[in-house]
Structures are given as C-alpha cells and as structure tokens.
Amino acid sequence: MPKLEIYKNLFLDKIGKNFTNLEISELLEPFKAEFDGFDESSGKIKIEFNDTNRPDLWSYLGLARQIKTYFFGEMPYYDFFSKKGDFKKFYGEILVDGKMSQIRPFIFGFLAKGLIINDKMLETLIQFQEKLCQNYGQKRRRIAMGMYNSNFIKFPISYIASSPNHKFVPLGMDYELSLLEINEKHPKGLEYSHIIKNFDKFPLLLDDNNNVVSYPPIINSNNIGSLKVGDTDLFVEVTGIDFEATLLALSIAACDFYDMGFEILPVKTVFREPFNLDFKELVCPYYFQEEVEFNVENINRLLGSNLTLERICLSLKKMGVNSYSKDFKNYIVPPFYRNDFLHEVDVIEDVMIGEGLSSFNPELPKAFAVGRLSPLEEFSRNVRNLMVGMGFQEMIYNYMGSKKDFIDRMNINDQNFLKVSNPMTENYEYIRASIIPNLLKSESVSSNFPYPHKIFEIGKVALRNLDTTEGTSTFTNLAFLMSGKEISFNEINSIVATLFYYLNIEINLIESKTTFYINGRGADIVIEGFNIGGFGEISPYVLNNFGIFIPCSVFEVNINKLMSRS
C-alpha cells in the first residue's frame, strides 16, 4: 500500500489551519489513511494508505484538498480542463507516430508556469511522481510520468517508434548510449526495460530540434529531462497503455501543480494514422469521466439509513462529488481528479464516508451459523501444500484480462471465453478460461531472475456453457509453469506423476491436440474416461508471442472434476 512522507508545515499551510499530530490522525481516518508517525528532525509526517482506489490523495496537496472539502466545505474547481466539444486554447502540441498504436499508444501533457521550484517542492514532486508511477502505474507498465524544464524544449514534440540503435545521453550519465544499450546497462533500463523490450521499435520523445526529451517509460534525457531547484517553467507528460488511466494520472498531476501555485497551460495531442480512436486529437488536461446514476432507495437499503436526497447530496459534496437530478433520476459528477466510480455501490460508499461511520448504529447479525471449510477448499489446500513442497511459488492473478493475452498470444479461439459487454478498458475485456496465460505473462517479465522458475496458482476460471441456466460454468483450476534450459516433457511428467501419487489418484495419458503445445509433446489427463486437464511443452510460436526465450512447460487441471474422482 502507498506510504507518504510529507512536510508537516507544507501540509498545514495548504489546509490553512494548525493541528496537533493526534488531530491530523483523526483528519485522515475518513480517507483510509493512517498517521504513522512524525520525525521532528526532518519535520515530516509519515502516512500509510489502506487501499489504492484514490491516487489523487498520494501527495500533501491531494490530501489537503480532500480535507478542506470534507471538513470545511471548500470545493475545488479547475478551469483549465477541456471537455468533449469544448477544447481549451493549447500552448504546445505532441504528435504521435501511428506505429505507437501497438507499442505504448497514449501520451498527454500540459505546461506549468509561474512558480520557482525550491528544494522542498522538488522533493514533493519527485515523491508524487514515484508513488503515481509505482503504485497506480503498476511500476511504470500502465502509466509513467515525466517532468522537464520547458525552456529547453521546442514544440511540437514528436512521440515516435524509434530504432533501438538511436543514441542519446540518458539522465545520470555523461556519454551516449543506444536505446538497446540503455536497456542492458542503465540501472533504470535493467529495472523497467521488460515493459517494452519485446517490440521491434521503442518509444522516444523528440522536440522540434530533434533533441531527445525522453525514452519513456525508462529514462529521461540528461540534457532536457532533469528538473532543478530554481526552474520555473515545466512540461509534464504521461505515457501509458490505458487511455483512462493515462488521462487520470495527468489530471491528478495538473490539479496538484495548480494547487501548488502554478498556472496550467493545456497541450494538444495529435494521433496519426493508423490509430483507431474515436478522436484524432485531444487537448489536455481533459475531463473524460462519466456520470453515474444512483437511487435513494438503494442507498438507504444498503446503509440501513433513512437519508433524504438533499442529505445524500451534502454527503457526496463533502467527498468533492457534485450531483444533480434530471427526469426523476439522480446522477453524480465525478471530480476532475477521480475515476473510481465504476458502479452505484461506489457512490454509496462515498455517501457512507461523507455521513461518517459513527452516524450508523452497529447491528448484530440476525443469523448465527458455525463456519467451516468447504470440501473443495480443503482439497485445494492439500494440493497447494503439495505444490509448495515440490518447490513451487504460489501466484495470485486477476480473473479478467485482454483478448491479446488470453486468446491471441495463446494461438487459440475464443469459443469458451466470456466477454464483458461493457468493459471499462480492453485490459479487462475477457474472463479467463485458463490460468496458463497468466503464468506465461509472469514468466515474460521474469527473465532477470535465476532459473529454473517454478510457479503455480489455484484459482477460478469461467467457461461458456449453454447447458446451464446462466450460460456459464465456474471451476477451480490448478495450473503450474516450469521454465529453464533443461526443462522438458520428461521433467514436467515427473512432477505430474509425483502430484497424483500423493493425491492417491490413478491417471491415464493420451496425446493432446492442444494448439499451444509443441506437436507430440503434450498430453491430456484422463480419469475414469473423463478429461480433466493436460500438460506439455509450450510451442516456440506462443513463447515468442509472450516474449519468452527459455523453454516452458505447463500443466492445468480442473480441481472440481479431480476432487469428484479422488
């Protein structure tokens, strides 16, 4: 979970009131944050958050903004945001190469002017950038942010798919390296190059003088990409693979810079062919969030309350959320810096926090029952212990993912997969029907760790099943992956034999026709005439799709079917 260290004096100055450490601790409670101590020598407060839904709070500026809104009714407003059909005047352009659509497609930015950066401000900005990129940005994979002295940049900026041999001086060095050499030699390249190393070309930011601004998401240029105390005019950009996540990160940054005292000047991003987007250009910061409908009866039913619409709207306003009614329906309008309203229940949570947890009377459960583990869970735990005993490391994955990862890279069709009809992002468009793609994706970013690799997961999968009322079936599967230069079919067959020996289950093997195995090196597992899974060596074609260059063998079985025949 995110942890912050913020200067107490800056924090209190931004709130506009003085508080003791105990009072600060109480101020943080509604926002799932804990006061973790005060260092008198540095003057810093330590704060730890208990969830990751509100990246806008991960700076003293964002926290102060929310505290002022919640406790003192000061609703922030930012007039530099463009909206659909209402683009603001822009002061620079970013031109996006069409080839970037398949690499790291999104980049948005703004200019911040009019304030001289001191040492505390610089430290604050660097910490904010790091928290946003590491946590919300999933260690720069999802989004990454760069900050530059704009006086050294000539617009327009070009965001191109560059040759790996392109050279520039990276930040922290005094000699040129090619992009490929940065990946292999620079500390940041070694840490983050796995994000883009599987592409033939790499992202590069160039200004109109053809000077390198940045190699996102790896490292800035040493000549342009270094902020210093005394700088006044900044260019801030965010690149990413997720449209809304990239825009939100930029919006949060713009609001923080504005609250710090900067003037925010919009920048236009122009997407060139063959981008398949609903728009060809966007002036940012841009308000993209959608309104969410809520129902008063649903709120009162879930909270056990009797709140009026007026009271609900006041509670939402304490959270920085505006609301309105139209045609007998009620809607919330998310703030510029938030995008965590995915469903009506998220609105209800904000109402609950706005009301204050102490305003709800605790109730004892109306029913009492003695709990115990289900037979499936007991069996799964036994299997889990066996896997750990054989030297495997357990993984935990999301059940949802993209068509590219679950289907295209696996070289299979989508007939068994469940597709979400209204996905928020293509990264969560399908529900998995197999755990193997998750294991391969982990392997694709683990090449820096010593071999062999042995990982597994016991988790849910969902398949299309027209014989059921719902049209789907959900199962618990066990899957594991082994990788290494010496890993072969015989090696994994030995592990499979050991597993079923200790489970006291007899199995039969038949040659598998599964398309992601090497021909002749895959087997289906049959028990009492029923196919419950299989194992084999992954084909080089599929390995290449995931950017894996070491042999891998995988195994997957349906634990529900396995248990019923044990």
Swiss-Prot record:
B5 domain mapped to chain residues: 287-362
Major location category of this protein: cytoplasm
Compartments where located: Cytoplasm
Pfam families: B5, tRNA_synthFbeta
Cofactor(s) it depends on: Mg(2+)
Residues reported in the UniProt entry to bind Mg(2+): D340, D346, E349, D350
The family this protein is said to belong to: Belongs to the phenylalanyl-tRNA synthetase beta subunit family. Type 2 subfamily.
Record-given protein name: Phenylalanine--tRNA ligase beta subunit
Organism name: Borreliella burgdorferi (strain ZS7) (Borrelia burgdorferi)
